[in-house]
Amino acid sequence: MGMRMMFTVFLLVVLTTTVVSFPSDSASDGRDDEAKDERSDMYELKRNGRCCHPACGKHFNCGR
């Protein structure tokens, strides 16, 4: 295979991957809602002065 052919195949793979990934984004909407709930729980714990999540645990006591 020549360099042009390899570059063309590379572009086709990249474009195909990009086009295929767009429709699958809408399928993750249900999982996004669950993640938002977990984040809101984390912020509620931060307001109470305790948080066991790694993102806020270094600033607050875990309370366990």
UniProtKB/Swiss-Prot annotation:
Q: What are the annotated disulfide bridges? A: 51-56, 52-62
Family the entry assigns: Belongs to the conotoxin A superfamily.
Keywords in alphabetical order: Amidation, Disulfide bond, Hydroxylation, Secreted, Signal, Toxin
Tissue expression profile of the protein: Expressed by the venom duct.
Matching entries from Pfam families are given as: Toxin_8 (PF07365)
- Entry protein name: Alpha-conotoxin CnID
| Subcellular compartments | Secreted
Q: Which residues carry this modification: 4-hydroxyproline?
A: 54
Which residues does this entry mark as bearing Cysteine amide?
62
Question: What further fact does the record state?
Answer: Found in injectable (milked) (IV) venom.
Q: Which organism is it from?
A: Conus consors
Secretion signal, residue range per the UniProt entry: 1-21
